[in-house]
A protein has these predicted regions:
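Generic beta-sheet signal
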Residues: 4, 143-151
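Active-site-proximal alpha-helix that buttresses catalytic centers in soluble enzyme cores
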Residues: 5-7, 11-72
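Phosphate-handling substructures
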Residues: 68-127
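Domain-level recognition of soluble alpha/beta enzyme cores
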Residues: 164-189
Length: 190
């Protein structure tokens, strides 16, 4: 069996302010660095054999905290980057809802809004999910892989791995900053 640990990055100032980050390359704040240190202690105890990360700074910095105690290097996987939120990046949800109430309602219901440059849910789910599937497929029988990514990317990627419709199902709710989830492959025949 292969363990795949999906780990969301630590807190940033945008998280603290309730701003949508998307592809904006925001660093961890002091709280985020402390969250990463504490979570890394727990994850290191699970015996990781490989660390992969989104190229965005907040994910890379979180992954690097785990690299030190494990002696592993961090491999950058571009497909693990956060979903693009287009024109809404840097804005607060309340401001978006006020300025575009109908579009906001569509987005909250799982609809896509390409007119704002927002990456579609299915597109994100497939991009991240297929990257995670390929990473797990390349793993050895007893490998423990840590994949450091982002809230929407992780949720949608997990939805894809589980074969669920990302337009109808909203993934791992409540995966706060620096929380992680364990998925286990089962490569044995049925």
């Amino acid at each position: 069996m292969t363990d795949l640990i999906l780990w969301r990055h630590g807190q940033t100032d945008y998280n603290l302010q309730g701003r949508i980050q998307g592809r904006v390359d925001i660093p961890l704040n002091d709280t985020g660095r402390e969250q990463a240190r504490r979570a890394a202690d727990c994850i290191a105890a699970l015996g990781p054999t490989r660390i992969v990360s989104s190229p965005l700074l907040r994910a890379r910095a979180t992954a690097e905290v785990l690299a030190s105690p494990t002696g592993l290097s961090v491999e950058i996987v571009p497909e693990l980057a956060e979903k693009s939120f287009g024109q809404w990046e840097g804005l607060k949800a309340a401001d978006i809802e006020k300025q575009w109430p109908d579009h906001y309602a569509t987005w909250r219901a799982g609809g896509d809004l390409p007119q704002f440059g927002i990456e579609g849910r299915r597109q994100t789910a497939q991009r991240v999910g297929e990257a995670l599937r390929a990473i797990a497929a390349d793993a050895g029988k007893d490998d423990v892989i840590v994949a450091v990514s982002h809230g929407a990317a992780t949720n949608l990627g997990a939805t894809h791995l589980l074969g669920m419709d990302p337009q109808q199902w909203f993934g791992l709710r409540g995966m706060s900053n620096c929380c992680y989830a364990l998925m286990r492959t089962n490569k044995r025949p049925p």
